[in-house]
Structure formats: structure tokens, C-alpha cells
């Protein structure tokens, strides 16, 4: 029997949620009730699979903690009042910390004036953010298209490249093994994990995947395309593969890819959705090699952990394909005033506080210590690697990685695996993480590995 709509039920549910939003604290009974509600609603109305995925943060069989609020720039508090050091960073969105006061203030001030744009009048913050990004980004990047997520920024980049190269008879994209560019149909065509791709096959035609970091394979793909008349329109890659397991290419790889693109007349699209905004010790990871892309994709941390926003920034030559008809690719909420306010404030904080340099310094210290732990526990840890505050610990197998995440959770440190490489646990904290909290994270990691070693020896 079909369920009939219920306005009364919807009204009661929304009123209950609004009451929760107004609360700053919960008593014990309210906490227990909220936990039960959230788990039940995820199971019945969101996706029960998410509950099983969160096995690593299971406490007492309840599938996981229910977050309540930010504890500080670098911590989260759950409904039970437990405070966690955030070493996951929302998969890289909290570069300037949780509820950074500068970002929150900018959004609140804009909210008091005009939350969303009219679509007809010119909105000043979109113009100012585009100008700011033109000044901030490397090379000749000049024009920005704004959207709401990293996947959308990649979609826009692919469409820009197609619109630019199709009249030139170039239709094929090169992506790389281990890549993650999102899960919408176009972005998924560039993503390289079969688990995400196979249910939606066939994907968009015209994508080739070559081994990441192998410039000879990239060169061969260009040469074969030239010989067969299937010339390459663009290369899309991450300077460091995030979801692939924080995979760093050999030094000079990006430079050589840039040379191939120039030689064969292809565009270079860099997906810095996760590596951008200071994460790796530079504002953009491509700056480590002084490489200048034709199209740059940003999102995640661009909104300061307060508002969702993505950006696709391109050179004037490439972006000009949209000049005659700016409605070829648009989005209703992209570049809205609240999101732009958050992005402008985020950039201001990153520059004023020199957070990219802090990421480099603290990241080097953390990584050295993680590598020492890897040497101490070679039967558990394969390798520790990373750049800046984008780090990973790769374990010997998936189960060992899951166990580490669970042990860290017990010690109130949030970590998680990477989407394309489950045995690799990412360490991706806010760039604002204090020295004291860095030391606590290292202490927790050492305790976690020691506990895991005892379990291994007891078997």
C-alpha cells in the first residue's frame, strides 16, 4: 500500500529540527533520543549503507558518534560531549579550521543584507572573488566560473575543454590510474576506480587512463593519438592524488606533463579540489613546480568550512568560448553571495595568517614522526607519505587500516581511509592545528599502533 503524504508529520518533524538548531546544549535524555533518531532516520530515509561504512567509529554497537558542534578551530564535539581532534578535516574542507570567526562573520554580515542573488542584477561579491582568484592563481588564469562542489568544478572544466578543442578536431582526454575527480557522469569518466564506475557504464567516451606519475606512458598516449588521428584535447590530473591514497608523483612530473601539453596543443587541467588553498604548503600544489595550468579546479576548503563553493578558473583564451553565450554552462546557486563571502574571507585568513607556510612546517614535523612509527612497526605499516598537511599512513592491508582508524577514534582522534585505497588512512587536519594538538595526535597514533601490535602478538 502506498504511503500517503502527511503535512502534519512533515510540519512536526521540521519544527522538531528547528528546536534542535536553536539549542546549544542537550541533557542526557535529549542526547540519547537524538542519537536514536539520527541512526533511525539514516537507516530509513538517507542510506543504511552509511551506517555500516562508519563501523570504524562504532561505540557500543550504535554504528557511530553523532556530531553536535565544533569544539574549537581544530576539534569536534559529539552529542555526548566527547571532543575529538579533527585529523580528517571533512576530506579537506576545514583548512582554516572549524567555524573560523572571520569566515563566519563575513557570512553573517552578508546574510543580514542579501543571502542569494537575484540572477538578473550584477552581484558584487562574485566579481570580487573572481578578481581575487585571478590575482591569487598562477600564470594566466583569469576568468572564474563558480559552482557548489568539486565535482561540478570538474564538469565545468571538461565542458570548457570540449568547447575549446572540438573545433580543433581534438576530442580525447587523458586521465590517470588512481584518479578521483568526482562521481557525476563526466567527472566519473575521468575517475579511475571500477567500484564507482561499473554500475554506470558506459560512461562518456573519449577518456584514456595512463599510470599516474609515469611520464613515458603519458608521452606514448600523446604519440599514439597523433598517429591515429585521435588527438588529445586535454590532460586532467591531480598534482597529488588524494583519494588514490595521497600518491605523490616523481619530482618534475607536472613539468613534463606541461611540456607534452604544449608540444601537442592539449590543455592541462589541474584538479586542486583537495590540494588547493594551502593544504600542501603552497597555496596551490602546482606551485611546487611552478607549473601553470590552462584550467584549475577548486572547491572543498575554498568555502572555509562554512559554505559550499567550487570554482573553475581558466585562461582568457580558453574561457572565451563562453563569451558569446554565457548561458552555455550555468548553475542557479553557483557564486551566490553567501558562498562568495565565505571564500573571500577564507583567502584573507590563509594569506593574513600565512597558513600555507604553517602547513609546510607542521606537516614536515608530523610526517617525520609518522615515518618513524612506520619504521618501528613494519609488520603493520607499509609507508607514511605526504606533503604539507596532506598525509597518509598506508597499512599492510585493509583490515589493519580499519583497525587503526578505530583505535584512533577510541582516543578521540578522527581519521578515515581514502576512497580509492582503503588500506591508506589519511591525515588531513585543519592547517590551524596547534603544536600541542600535533603532539597529542602523534601520542594517540603511537598508542594505537602499540595496541594493534599486542593484538597481533596474541594471535
UniProtKB/Swiss-Prot annotation:
Residues bound to pyridoxal 5'-phosphate: 150-151, 274, 332
Molecular function terms, GO-annotated: diamine transaminase activity; identical protein binding; putrescine--2-oxoglutarate transaminase activity; pyridoxal phosphate binding
Keywords associated with the record: Aminotransferase, Pyridoxal phosphate, Transferase
Record flagged with keyword Transferase: yes
Residues modified as N6-(pyridoxal phosphate)lysine: 300
CDD domains, alphabetized: OAT_like (cd00610)
Listed GO biological process terms: L-lysine catabolic process; putrescine catabolic process
Pathway assigned in UniProt: Amine and polyamine degradation; putrescine degradation; 4-aminobutanal from putrescine (transaminase route): step 1/1
Cited Gene3D superfamilies: Aspartate Aminotransferase, domain 1 (3.90.1150.10), Type I PLP-dependent aspartate aminotransferase-like (Major domain) (3.40.640.10)
Superkingdom to which the source organism belongs: Bacteria
Top EC class, one word: transferase
Reactions it catalyzes: an alkane-alpha,omega-diamine + 2-oxoglutarate = an omega-aminoaldehyde + L-glutamate; putrescine + 2-oxoglutarate = 1-pyrroline + L-glutamate + H2O; cadaverine + 2-oxoglutarate = 5-aminopentanal + L-glutamate
EC number: 2.6.1.82, 2.6.1.29
Protein family membership: Belongs to the class-III pyridoxal-phosphate-dependent aminotransferase family. Putrescine aminotransferase subfamily.
Function, as annotated: Catalyzes the aminotransferase reaction from putrescine to 2-oxoglutarate, leading to glutamate and 4-aminobutanal, which spontaneously cyclizes to form 1-pyrroline. This is the first step in one of two pathways for putrescine degradation, where putrescine is converted into 4-aminobutanoate (gamma-aminobutyrate or GABA) via 4-aminobutanal. Also functions as a cadaverine transaminase in a a L-lysine degradation pathway to succinate that proceeds via cadaverine, glutarate and L-2-hydroxyglutarate.
UniProt-recorded name of the protein: Putrescine aminotransferase
Gene giving rise to this polypeptide: patA
Amino acid at each position: 500500500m502506498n504511503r500517503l503524504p502527511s503535512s502534519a508529520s512533515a510540519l512536526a518533524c521540521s519544527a522538531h529540527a528547528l528546536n534542535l538548531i536553536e539549542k546549544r546544549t542537550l541533557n542526557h535524555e535529549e542526547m540519547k533520543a537524538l542519537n536514536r533518531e539520527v541512526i533511525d532516520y539514516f537507516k530509513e530515509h538517507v542510506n543504511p549503507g552509511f551506517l555500516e561504512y562508519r563501523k570504524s567509529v562504532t561505540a557500543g554497537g550504535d554504528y557511530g558518534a553523532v556530531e553536535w558542534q565544533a569544539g574549537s578551530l581544530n576539534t569536534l564535539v559529539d552529542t555526548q560531549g566527547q571532543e575529538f581532534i579533527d585529523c580528517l578535516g571533512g576530506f579537506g574542507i576545514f583548512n582554516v579550521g572549524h567555524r573560523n570567526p572571520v569566515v563566519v562573520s563575513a557570512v553573517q554580515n552578508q546574510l543580514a543584507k542579501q543571502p542569494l542573488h537575484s540572477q538578473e542584477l550584477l552581484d558584487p561579491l562574485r566579481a570580487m572573488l573572481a578578481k581575487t582568484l585571478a590575482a591569487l592563481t598562477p600564470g594566466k588564469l583569469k576568468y572564474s566560473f563558480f559552482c557548489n562542489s568539486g565535482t561540478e568544478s570538474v564538469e565545468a572544466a571538461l565542458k570548457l575543454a570540449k568547447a575549446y578543442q572540438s573545433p580543433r578536431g581534438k576530442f580525447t582526454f587523458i586521465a590517470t590510474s588512481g584518479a578521483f575527480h568526482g562521481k557525476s557522469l563526466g567527472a566519473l569518466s575521468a575517475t579511475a576506480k571500477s567500484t564507482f564506475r561499473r554500475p554506470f557504464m558506459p560512461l562518456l567516451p573519449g577518456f584514456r587512463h595512463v599510470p599516474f606519475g609515469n611520464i613515458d606512458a603519458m608521452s606514448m598516449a600523446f604519440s599514439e593519438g597523433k598517429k591515429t588521428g585521435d588527438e588529445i584535447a586535454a590532460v586532467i590530473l591531480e598534482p597529488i592524488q588524494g583519494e588514490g591514497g595521497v600518491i605523490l608523483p616523481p619530482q618534475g612530473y607536472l613539468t613534463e606533463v606541461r611540456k607534452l601539453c604544449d608540444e601537442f596543443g592539449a590543455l592541462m587541467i589541474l584538479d586542486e579540489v583537495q590540494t588547493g588553498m594551502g593544504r600542501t604548503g603552497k597555496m596551490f600544489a602546482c606551485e611546487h613546480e611552478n607549473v601553470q595550468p590552462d584550467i584549475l579546479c577548486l572547491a572543498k576548503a575554498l568555502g572555509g568550512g562554512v559554505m559550499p563553493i567550487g570554482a573553475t578558473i581558466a585562461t582568457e583564451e580558453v574561457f572565451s568560448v563562453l563569451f558569446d553565450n554565457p548561458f552555455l554552462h550555468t548553475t542557479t546557486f553557483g557564486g551566490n553571495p553567501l558562498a562568495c563571502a565565505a571564500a573571500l574571507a577564507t583567502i584573507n585568513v590563509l594569506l593574513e595568517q600565512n597558513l600555507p607556510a604553517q602547513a609546510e612546517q607542521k606537516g614536515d614535523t608530523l610526517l617525520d614522526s609518522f615515518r618513524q612509527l612506520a619504521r618501528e612497526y613494519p609488520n603493520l605499516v607499509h609507508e607514511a607519505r605526504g606533503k604539507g598537511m596532506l598525509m597518509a599512513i598506508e597499512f599492510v592491508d585493509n583490515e589493519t587500516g580499519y583497525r587503526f582508524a578505530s583505535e584512533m577514534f577510541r582516543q578521540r582522534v578522527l581519521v578515515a581511509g581514502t576512497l580509492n585505497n582503503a588500506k591508506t588512512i589519511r591525515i588531513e587536519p585543519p592547517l590551524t592545528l596547534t603544536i600541542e594538538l600535533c603532539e597529542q595526535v602523534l601520542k594517540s597514533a603511537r598508542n594505537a599502533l602499540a595496541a594493534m601490535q599486542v593484538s597481533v602478538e596474541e594471535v
